[in-house]
Structures are given as C-alpha cells and as structure tokens.
Amino acid sequence: MTADKSLFIRAMPFLFILSWASGFPITRLGLEYTEPFTLLWVRSAFVLAIVVPFALIVRAPWPHWKEVAHIAVVGVTLQCLYLGSMFSALDGDVSQGVAALVAGMQPLLTAAVVGITLGERVTRRQWIGFTLGFAGLFIVLSERLGIGAGTMAGFMFAGLTPIFITAASLYQKKFCANSDLRIVMIVQQA
C-alpha cells in the first residue's frame, strides 16, 4: 500500500464524520433557498457525481436485478421517506436539536423490533449501550431543544424519521447485508 493510499484510508473516517456532521447545517441553509425534495435531488445528484465515476474506475461488481430491487426499496425508504421527512420537518421550522433527538431514537426503536422482525436477541448490555447513547445525545442537544415555532406538520414529519430509518435499516440487513456499498450508494441515490 502506498503512503498516499494509506493516508487516504486513515482520513476516510474523519471525512465521513465531517460530511455527516455537516448535514443539519447544510440542510437548514439549503432549505432557505429551495424546497425539501429539490434539495434532496441536488444532494443525490452531488453524491452520484462522485460515486458513479469511482465505481466505474474500480469496476465495482453489479449485482443481480433482484438484489438491485431490494437496494432500491431501501433507497426509497431512506432517501425519499426518511430524508424527505427530515427535510420537511426542518422546513416546517422544527429545530435541528429536536429533529436530531427524534431521529436519534432510531437505535432504540431498532432494538425494540429487531427480535420480531429478524429474530435477533438484544442483550441487556446492548440495551444499556443504546440507552446511554440516547442519553448522551440528549445531553449534547439539550441546549438546542427549544421547541420553537415548528408547525404541526413539521413535528409529524420529525416523528416519522425514526420509523423510516428503522424500517430501512432492518430491510437492508435482511436483504442487502452483503451488497457492494459502491453500488448500494448509486442505486439508493438514483
């Protein structure tokens, strides 16, 4: 492995955190100039402009069409339903703190239903971890939890976010767990 490649691989987690953490501020800024689903389209186009050339260069293997269909179901659930609800909540003047806290319930919701949906057992230790994680999220966001002037529709959209991301996560784990992430990103954004 070359030094440049090694540096890039070591930097990837930090680049991911930077891109993920910038999501709320960039979304809030973008919603000042455009509608939620237009912003989602721009976001998807940006991701595709980066990922498609990369996947072509590395010759990422294209899966069978049945697997593509499963990946597309996850993509619609994540990109349209989850992010569409999140962007609509923020557009409905729900504070970023409240939206993040509600969406942050996803691990708890997933743990609550993973036994029923996938037959997996959640241990006491995992429950403690999920609870501590949610408590940490609450503490970090506590100063930004002002309910503010959010609309009823905005709060309803925020309430849907953990449901949609949980559904997408469980479906992906069941049907797309071994899919090539480069192709997953392309199909989910398309």
Map each language-model feature to its residues.
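Hydrophobic transmembrane alpha-helices of multi-pass small-molecule transport proteins
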Residues: V51, V113, V122-R144, T161-P162
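Specific alpha-helical transmembrane segments that line the substrate/conduction pathway
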Residues: T38-A49, L78, F87-R121, T161
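Hydrophobic transmembrane alpha-helices of multi-pass small-molecule transporters
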Residues: L48-A55, L83, P107-G115, F130, ...
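Glycine-/small-residue-enriched transmembrane alpha-helix faces in small-molecule transporters
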Residues: M1-W41, A149-K174
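Cytoplasmic-side transmembrane-helix entry/capping segments in multi-pass membrane proteins
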Residues: P13, K66-G75, V122-F134, G154-F155, ...
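Specific transmembrane alpha-helical segments of multi-pass solute transporters/efflux pumps
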Residues: S19, G23-F24, V52-A103, I139
